[in-house]
């Protein structure tokens, strides 16, 4: 009889897509897999597209959402725990794998109360509130970055990323230098408004090509900015969203982007030089901590959003464009920090805790 895993993750792609990667891997190994999420967030539409059955519980974030929700929080969480217990009693999993998001707290508690082994995985360099609590009683605590938990509390396994990212061929840096700009699916206005002028100044003394993801609703203004700075369509590609990010990574010599956990792990896995511009309003400033994992290894550059302007980006990139071997060196350093077997490692830990239960 095959084993069964319930994956718990929700809210953002940074939690959901690593969970899907592990779910797909477990299914290939003969496991049955289902999911617990919330009905009003990304997982509700994304998970079913991957042929994974999903059950829903009702829970919302408490932190930073006002006094009314804080007062109601104990009742909401208790109700969510009861809903999760009902789902788990029906699903009868051998293990629960919690990958982050508000949904993991109540479901992790429900798993513990039912004696179901619990494995948690933290994608960010600073653990979220739910995982900090669940780590106190989880059967196995896994982390993508060494700084997420206290020394000795977690197993370092990396972030599960798509296998296709690891297969991206090493590009020989040559003229023109290819610069990829990715601000997330919604874009990042600081990148959209600053970089066309900065690239124009850099392009006066260096041959560069640009592929810029603007995010929804910003295509026209960014295209106009590049045209105003005399960029031709031959060396500039602007899109609201890049569907094939693997091709974009393969094309790029330098990536300018936010530093969400999955992005940092993908950059390392692809072996690319990055300039990280952390989202300044991330909880606990975890995007800066994520970026530091590569920065301290001389595998990436960091530019705080408050310092991000035309002059600073020109000063930052000019030495690398003038000496492309520095780009190659930084990309190689990033690749050395990648943990390439993260998906298999997470699956292995799920297997191990179920074996101990048998």
Curated annotation (Swiss-Prot):
It is a peripheral membrane protein. It catalyses: di-trans,octa-cis-undecaprenyl diphospho-N-acetyl-alpha-D-muramoyl-L-alanyl-D-glutamyl-meso-2,6-diaminopimeloyl-D-alanyl-D-alanine + UDP-N-acetyl-alpha-D-glucosamine = di-trans,octa-cis-undecaprenyl diphospho-[N-acetyl-alpha-D-glucosaminyl-(1->4)]-N-acetyl-alpha-D-muramoyl-L-alanyl-D-glutamyl-meso-2,6-diaminopimeloyl-D-alanyl-D-alanine + UDP + H(+). The keyword Cell cycle applies. It is found in: Cell inner membrane. Keywords: Cell cycle, Cell division, Cell inner membrane, Cell membrane, Cell shape, Cell wall biogenesis/degradation, Glycosyltransferase, Membrane, Peptidoglycan synthesis, Transferase. It comes from the Bacteria. UDP-N-acetyl-alpha-D-glucosamine binds at residues 12-14, 124, 162, 185, 242, 261-266, 287. One of its GO terms (molecular function) is undecaprenyldiphospho-muramoylpentapeptide beta-N-acetylglucosaminyltransferase activity. Pathway: Cell wall biogenesis; peptidoglycan biosynthesis. One of its GO terms (cellular component) is plasma membrane. One of its GO terms (biological process) is regulation of cell shape. Cell wall formation. Catalyzes the transfer of a GlcNAc subunit on undecaprenyl-pyrophosphoryl-MurNAc-pentapeptide (lipid intermediate I) to form undecaprenyl-pyrophosphoryl-MurNAc-(pentapeptide)GlcNAc (lipid intermediate II). This is UDP-N-acetylglucosamine--N-acetylmuramyl-(pentapeptide) pyrophosphoryl-undecaprenol N-acetylglucosamine transferase. It comes from Pseudoalteromonas translucida (strain TAC 125). The gene is murG.
